[in-house]
Amino acid sequence: MATDELASKLSRRLQMEGEGGEATEQPGLNGAAAAAAAEAPDETAQALGSADDELSAKLLRRADLNQGIGEPQSPSRRVFNPYTEFKEFSRKQIKDMEKMFKQYDAGRDGFIDLMELKLMMEKLGAPQTHLGLKSMIQEVDEDFDSKLSFREFLLIFRKAAAGELQEDSGLQVLARLSEIDVSTEGVKGAKNFFEAKVQAINVSSRFEEEIKAEQEERKKQAEEVKQRKAAFKELQSTFK
């Protein structure tokens, strides 16, 4: 009995080797289950291969960056979804902000640089100094490229809504003048818009007044020096 069983097993093994090692159905499995069992190793191998390829790509990318080959991806160039990242704003608000951003992106490069920001503030009726414009950009410039991406532009309104901007700062003025659309908000919106515009003009006027005051002070000091020199010369002439 044992000899017959051993002979049967050897015969079975020889048959499998003769057929090229093809697997037969496992005992207790139907045809579909056997096919799934046969395909499982292939799927596992494919998944492992895909993971290996992804890991290899990341390692090669990191090696290139370490060797100075290629450029790291800055936050401003990463693809982001404004509707999920800036959930505090409605889709309409984000669309309006995007429309405004594109309006002043004269170079159509996806950024608002210093000169484009200068033009924007002038058109909004709140011109800024060169240092003021640089300060505005620096406050939200996360990647330190000295210009505003659309994401950084949205950060201005996030900070304004959260009360994180100074009352008379350039970014606060920009947010106030930009957030109201007179054509869609009606009389109340127009009232708020012009109130914000008046405040922005007042800030600009105060800045101009400070400059004029400094100029007047310098003129006054120069006049006093001139008068002292004249008095000294007159005093000298009396002793001649």
UniProtKB/Swiss-Prot annotation:
SUPFAM superfamilies: EF-hand. GO terms for molecular function: calcium ion binding. Residues 1-51 are annotated as: Disordered. InterPro entries: AIF-1_EF_pair, EF-hand-dom_pair, EF_hand_dom, EFHD1/2. The modification N6-acetyllysine is found at residue 233. The modification N-acetylalanine is found at residue 2. Residues 32-47 have a biased composition (Low complexity). Ca(2+) 2 binds at residues 141, 143, 145, 147, 152. Keywords: Acetylation, Calcium, Membrane, Metal-binding, Phosphoprotein, Repeat. It is found in: Membrane raft. Interacts with CASP9; with inactive form. May regulate B-cell receptor (BCR)-induced immature and primary B-cell apoptosis. Plays a role as negative regulator of the canonical NF-kappa-B-activating branch. Controls spontaneous apoptosis through the regulation of BCL2L1 abundance. This is EF-hand domain-containing protein D2. It comes from Mus musculus (Mouse). The lineage of its organism: Eukaryota, Metazoa, Chordata, Craniata, Vertebrata.
